[in-house]
Regions:
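Intrinsically disordered, Lys/Arg-rich low-complexity segments
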Residues: 1-65, 100
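Loop/turn segments within WD40 beta-propeller blades
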Residues: 60-64, 118-128, 182, 188-194, ...
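Beta-propeller domains
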Residues: 70-109, 136-169
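WD40-repeat beta-propellers
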Residues: 78-80, 140-145, 188, 205-209, ...
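Conserved strand-to-loop turn within each blade of WD40 beta-propeller repeats
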Residues: 71-74, 133-137, 199-203, 209-210, ...
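A structural motif specific to WD40 beta-propellers
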Residues: 88, 103-105, 151-153, 173-176, ...
């Protein structure tokens, strides 16, 4: 019995030694397979990195789209888009890539008479702007313009004699017309997204709210006295030339200056109260320095404030004068 037990123990020990030896050989044989797999994956992972570098080097430069709107005496409102490559700001880029491409976006008769002025509002959250146009037909027409660049359509287009392509933007829509003035509209401006200022030959400046386009306030400028008949006067017999030529709003939105027909002065208005704050007359020496002759009207034609609001300029028929907030001229 003792001999049989010892023989059984030896057989079991041999069996266990054989199992451990086989397990050791199996583990040794699997190690090189794992190493070869890792090396292959490392080699394949480097290939996409080289491909991405090639695509970056061959990528085309991005482009900028600029929308331009013009109005004419032929009652036509013309909109077109200019696409410019961003390399135009790089002095080392070639000039051939800097040439812009143009495409018409809209072209139609917006008024029944000449277009006198245009104004664009700031974009809203939907990337849309309001375009206001003023005309001698006493109307202010409103349009909704999209700030996103027009997309070229794959649909067949009608033949055109124009040298530029035609790309219509379906997001552009007509909103309607405003009848806030009784005579020709000369100036439009959106100082903020919620306000529209308009000036006309009826000697008024109307302040409208863009939410519902109602008139919040109207500033009435005085009718000038008849002093001679200046050159270029188009008033009827027995009448005097009237109307607001231009206005300029201070960056603080508290002060506005206006110049009108038949007046050799500039008027200052308080936008908080809506009342006149002062008058600045143009003396003879100043008009002569600005190039105004003996038969000139001497009236201001254009106004503009500086960015900091410390200076403003008055434009005449043949020259301009820059004023400061402290000095006279």
């Amino acid at each position: 019995m003792v001999k049989r037990k010892s023989e059984d123990a030896q057989l079991s020990a041999r069996a266990t030694n054989g199992k451990t030896a086989r397990f050791a050989e199996a583990t040794k044989s699997t190690k090189p397979v794992k190493k070869s797999a890792t090396t292959k994956s490392a080699k394949t992972s480097t290939k996409p990195a080289v491909a991405t570098n090639d695509t970056k080097s061959n990528s085309k430069p991005e482009s900028l789209s600029i929308q331009i709107v013009t109005g004419s005496y032929e009652r036509v409102l013309h909109g077109f888009a200019a696409t410019v490559s961003e390399t135009v700001f790089d002095p080392e880029a070639s000039k051939e890539q800097d040439e812009p491409t143009y495409s018409d976006t809209f072209l139609f008769a917006a008024h029944s008479s000449a277009v006198r002025c245009l104004a664009l509002s700031a974009p809203n959250e939907a990337h849309k702007r309001v375009l206001a146009t003023g005309s001698t037909d006493e109307r202010i027409n409103l349009f909704n313009l999209s700030t996103s660049p027009p997309v070229v359509s794959d649909k067949p287009q009608l033949p055109s004699l124009s040298a530029t392509s035609i790309i219509e933007n379906p997001r552009n829509k007509e909103l309607g017309s405003l009848l806030h003035h009784a005579r020709s509209v000369n100036k439009l401006q959106f100082p903020t997204r919620g306000k529209l200022f308009s000036a006309a030959d009826d000697n008024t400046v109307a302040i409208s709210r863009t939410r519902d386009w109602t008139v919040l306030s109207t500033i009435k400028c005085p009718i000038p006295k008849a002093v001679g008949r200046p050159s270029g006067d188009t008033a009827g017999p027995g009448e005097v030339p009237t109307g607001v030529n231009d206005f300029a709003i201070h960056p603080s939105m508290k002060v506005m200056v206006t110049v009108g027909k038949g007046e050799r002065c500039m008027r200052l208005w308080n936008l908080v109260t809506g009342k006149k704050a002062g008058v600045l007359n143009f003396d003879k020496s100043l008009l002569q320095a600005a190039g105004e002759g003996r038969y000139s009207s001497g009236e201001g034609r254009k106004l503009a404030w500086g960015e900091d609001g410390e200076e403003y300029v008055v434009g005449f028929e043949r020259g301009a004068v820059v004023y400061g907030m402290v000095s006279d001229a």
